[in-house]
Amino acid sequence: TTMTGDWNGTRTELAEKGIKFDGTIAVDGSYLADGGYDAHQAPTFGTQFGVGTTLDMQKLAGWNGVTVRALVTARQGESTSLRGIQDPTAPQWANSQANWGRGNSGSRLSELYIDKKFDSGWDVRLGRMGLGTEFNTMACDFQSNAFCAAQMGKWQGKLWYNTPVSQWGGRVKYNLTPELFAQVGVFEYNPENALERHGWNLDTKNADGVNILSEVVWSPKQGLNDLAGSYRLGTLYNTADDAKNQYDVAYAAKTVGEDRSYGGWLAFEQQLTSTGAGRQGLHSFGNFTFHDRTTTAVSDSQQLGLKYYGLFEGHPNDILGFAVNRVQINDRYRDFVNTTRTNPANVQQYNKTLLNKDAEYNLELNYSYYPAKWLMLRPLLQYVVYPGATTQVDNALVVGLGSKFIF
């Protein structure tokens, strides 16, 4: 069910022929109620619009197992993290509004790929896509990007671009069993793709190496307590060798070049109790990332959370959620920043905010309410401890309201 309905039956007719359309508008609203760097400013809103189509080429052209997917997105708005929570010289590591990630953009080509599934268990996908739609995938049932989408794209985001940013590449998946698959992917690394003004950049002239990803995913239908779960283990290897893109974070940016970087993740989602049909009941999830300490300002992160589906009778899709995230700052990077800022000889950096804590912590409590299948409203509270990994900025209390429309 969508906000625009079935278009007098046209939508169903097109779907039966192999043509499906989808569209969403998501709005993240945040207000810094207390603490942070500059509280009590006006609320900010980050908005994402997306419209896409999925073509079943078997129905349209007789191509067995072939699907074509296209998605265009646009993001506009402002960020409470930037405007109120953070000291500009010690940015918050997470962001209160996931839909503000990568800033504003008039429009972007976020997906354009062809996928072929083989009877032998192989699945090949080629084209443009975001890394987080293929690897380290995670639901977005929270507004903070510390709990939304592939966490590798946040903590190693200099190299890893999630949707809405896309890049050329390919992914090969092999289903070893109905519950276990392995996949590898190779994607261009092109910093130009992330720029707000290059949402439709299709050339590779500014590419610098590639991202090589691998992942094993086990999704038992009867795991813990005979309930479904999903477990992911993966790695990232990047081959960029231009010092402006790949450099040692213990020195001034872009001065000591490196020729590789790596990272890894372990993620899970496991249903713990069942109180009805489908997903109803208590679910747990977690995401743990590890990063190259030579080239990455974040050394590791930990995320744990709980979601309860269908807490109230008659609302099986509603979700009560709570999650905690810890972002560990690379001590090599932190020591360099603090040494620079305590040296009077460094006129531009001297006396700027010190990163005097080793981590930032993000918490969110929310309730995702579905008054209709096409509408979600999400009141929420967020609390940020040591924003920017410093005690020189107060802990921040954020009140928010997210919404999503499906049309």
For each predicted feature, which ranges?
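Short loop/turn motifs that connect adjacent beta-strands in outer-membrane beta-barrel proteins
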Residues: 4-21, 55-68, 120-121, 179, ...
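Residue-level signature of outer-membrane beta-barrel architecture
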Residues: 14, 27, 55-59, 116, ...
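Outer membrane beta-barrel
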Residues: 42, 46-191, 296-301, 311-338
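Outer-membrane beta-barrel "beta-signal"
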Residues: 322, 395-407
